[in-house]
Every structure is written in structure tokens, then in C-alpha cells.
Regions:
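Short, Lys/Arg-enriched N-terminal segments with co-localized hydrophobic residues
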Residues: 3, 9-21
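Charge-biased, low-complexity intrinsically disordered regions
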Residues: 12, 21-196
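A residue-level detector for conformationally permissive "hinge/kink" positions
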Residues: 1-2, 165
């Protein structure tokens, strides 16, 4: 039984399951040309999710207070990680003001006094990392990913993608991770079929 400790001493248990082959990532050439310095990674863990984690929410509330004190609404998109993703959106022909990066959207909610959605411990943790870092972080149930390779490319016209809580999302021109079945995540939203 392994445990992951949160910065303030909180913890969530991580239980090993049968050894699964880690997914590999292939970056399409057209994407790599626009984002040559891109660095990505995959972290895999067998976890037991819970409805809420009070100590995690203490960290989330602290980070929300820090964001609200440090930024005005029109300054959020100047954070380097958010700015880099917005630049990629523009390079692929997508308007980052219409299709916001999830980390930017979360920070904007905080500044407007709306807070962060409370979903469950795993999603809440991912949202904290996203808000703190400025990067859009995807979290997927590995058992729902088809195949051994994820492909990072650009959304195509007419490509079907059902964003979590958003319905059908036009991902043409958005960076998108795909498995053997289709899109599973963009920096704006993850796909319904791969949620935990």
C-alpha cells in the first residue's frame, strides 16, 4: 500500500493494481511544428476516489485566496502557462476567448467570486494543480482509454467530442489527445467517456 502525501500533511491512498503497460504518447508532426518545445507526461496510479477531502479543500481555498489577491480578471491570461496555451490555440485557428483553457476558466471563476466546482477528490485535486500551475491538466480513467497509444494532434472539422458537462464541443482547431476510438481530452475540456 503506497500513499501520496499532500503538501499540508493530508494524504490519499494509492493502491497498486495488476501491472498495466503505461500508455505511450505520439505527437503529430503538424502539432510538433507549432509547439516544438512542448513537454508532456503521464502519471498512472490505482486510486480509491472519495466524495470530498476537507484538508484538500483547505489547500484549494488557500490557493483561491492567493489567485484572487494576485490577479485581476484581465491579468489571468498573462500567466505564462495560460499564455502559451492561448498562443497554441491561435496558431491552430481557435479563438482562446471563446474556447478558454480550463486553468484560465477556473482562475476566472475564482476572481469573480464563484469558486471552484466541487466534484470529487480526484477532480478537485486536478483542479488545484491546474489553478496553481496554470496548465490544463487532464485526468482520465485508464480503463476507458482504447489502445496503448495516445496521439496529440489538432481537432478536425466535424470530429465528435462530448465535453464533460458541456455537451458536444467543436474541437476543430483545438489541441486534442486521441485514443483508438477518438478524442479524449483538450485543454478546454475532457471527454465524457473517459471520466472517472
Amino acid at each position: 500500500n503506497n500513499e501520496v502525501f499532500l503538501r499540508d500533511g493530508g494524504r490519499c491512498s494509492v493502491y497498486p493494481k495488476e501491472q498495466k503497460r503505461m500508455k505511450t504518447i505520439h505527437i503529430e508532426n503538424n502539432f510538433a511544428q507549432v509547439c516544438p518545445g512542448l513537454k508532456i507526461g503521464i502519471i498512472g496510479a490505482q486510486v480509491t476516489n472519495t466524495e470530498t477531502a476537507p484538508r484538500l479543500w483547505e489547500q484549494i481555498d488557500d490557493e483561491a485566496s492567493r489567485i484572487a489577491a494576485a490577479y485581476k480578471i484581465d491579468e489571468i491570461n498573462k500567466r505564462p502557462a495560460i499564455q502559451a496555451t492561448r498562443k497554441a490555440y491561435r496558431s491552430f485557428g481557435k479563438d482562446p476567448n471563446r474556447y478558454r483553457v480550463s486553468s484560465e476558466a477556473l482562475c476566472r471563476r475564482i476572481i469573480r467570486g464563484l469558486g471552484i466546482y466541487r466534484i470529487d477528490t480526484l477532480v478537485d485535486l486536478i483542479n488545484l494543480v491546474s489553478v496553481r500551475s496554470g496548465y490544463s491538466i487532464g485526468a482520465f480513467d485508464a480503463d476507458r482509454i482504447e489502445g496503448d497509444t495516445l496521439i496529440l494532434g489538432v481537432g478536425k472539422e466535424g470530429e465528435i467530442f462530448r465535453g464533460i458537462g458541456r455537451g458536444v464541443l467543436n474541437i476543430e482547431g483545438l489541441p486534442v489527445y486521441r485514443d483508438d476510438k477518438g478524442g479524449i481530452g483538450t485543454p478546454t475540456s475532457d471527454e465524457e467517456r473517459t471520466k472517472q
